[in-house]
Amino acid sequence: MKQPYLLLTPGPLSTTASVKDAMQIDYCTWDSDYRHVTETIRQQILAMAQANPENYTTVLLQGSGSFGVEATIGTAVPRTDATLMIAINGAYGHRISQIAEYYDIPHIDVVFNEDEAVDPVRIEATLADHPEITHFATVHSETTTGILNPIEALMPIMHEHGIVTIIDAMSSLGGVPISIDELDCDYLISSANKCVQGVPGFAFIIAKQATLAHTADNARSLCLDLYDQWQAMTKQPGKWRFTSPTHVVHAFAQALIELQAEGGVTPRYQRYRASQQLLSDGLQALGFELVIDPAIQGPIITSFKYPNVDFDFADFYQFIKQRGFVIYPGKVSNIPSFRIGTIGDVDTTDIQRLLTIIGDYQQLHR
């Protein structure tokens, strides 16, 4: 079946034909070959994230990226004598807060405007005001707008206060250079269908073993017990506790091969960045304003304001879709906007074609 359009979205995204082909065979979860693939993936993820395997482990978890976030929050934070600080500047930070609410976890939300990055100075001031804080969570690439938050500046602050750190790197790991060894974070979460360019079906959590080892019995959920999942994968390498998405795992294994063939994370970041820059410059030339300052813009997805009050996004969307691309509606709460992603099997040639299509639309609606 021919793919009718490219996804210019933050994931699920457009994948290569070879990633799709990897899902054409059925696999047995107990088979040694399959378990070898799973175990290899776990080690490759550590290498991709520059995480020392003597200190860190990768835990794979069935479900979407949010399953991974919920499992981490629900396992990392003890049932008593713990308070979670959440730095929020978009919908995915608010989702962490929702998880804390569901689990009755005491939490302090430090909320920023959606068009501003998390400010380390304000975070440090909050820590000074709240000595009860034991854990910290934030989103690296907040795809509500496309902001890339300054995790490199935040982690040293947390270390000074002995805070356990949780980074939602759903839309950055694999597409933005990250060194977990340098960050020295406790948990970093991502998903198969983001910058590694696999398909949806599982999340993965890179966890500091010394921290995770103290989380037994913390989990509020059987299926989302990160500690128990880790123990199962450690005692029986390649084994998941419950039925794993076998086809998705093989697609991800192929996607990792292709990431290496591209040269690794840095060349992929450069491709994403080139596409984002072309998109940003091109749409501004066509009359669309950016939602956020380019200084805090990441390469994953870009938000644009509606050009005027009469702009019909539904009509705009269909015009573009009929010509081979799918984009995203806006998620900023108080600014009418739309979003366009620049990750996946997409390059500047595709972005230039999109700009031509949008230029044609603008000509028709002058």
Curated annotation (Swiss-Prot):
Coiled coil: none annotated. InterPro entries: Aminotrans_V_dom (IPR000192), NH2EtPonate_pyrv_transaminase (IPR012703), PyrdxlP-dep_Trfase (IPR015424), PyrdxlP-dep_Trfase_major (IPR015421), PyrdxlP-dep_Trfase_small (IPR015422), SP_NH2Trfase/AEP_transaminase (IPR024169). It comes from the Bacteria. Its cofactor is pyridoxal 5'-phosphate. It catalyses: (2-aminoethyl)phosphonate + pyruvate = phosphonoacetaldehyde + L-alanine. Its EC number is 2.6.1.37. Keywords: Aminotransferase, Pyridoxal phosphate, Pyruvate, Transferase. One of its GO terms (molecular function) is 2-aminoethylphosphonate-pyruvate transaminase activity. One of its GO terms (biological process) is organic phosphonate catabolic process. Disulfide bonds: none annotated. Belongs to the class-V pyridoxal-phosphate-dependent aminotransferase family. PhnW subfamily. Involved in phosphonate degradation. This is 2-aminoethylphosphonate--pyruvate transaminase.
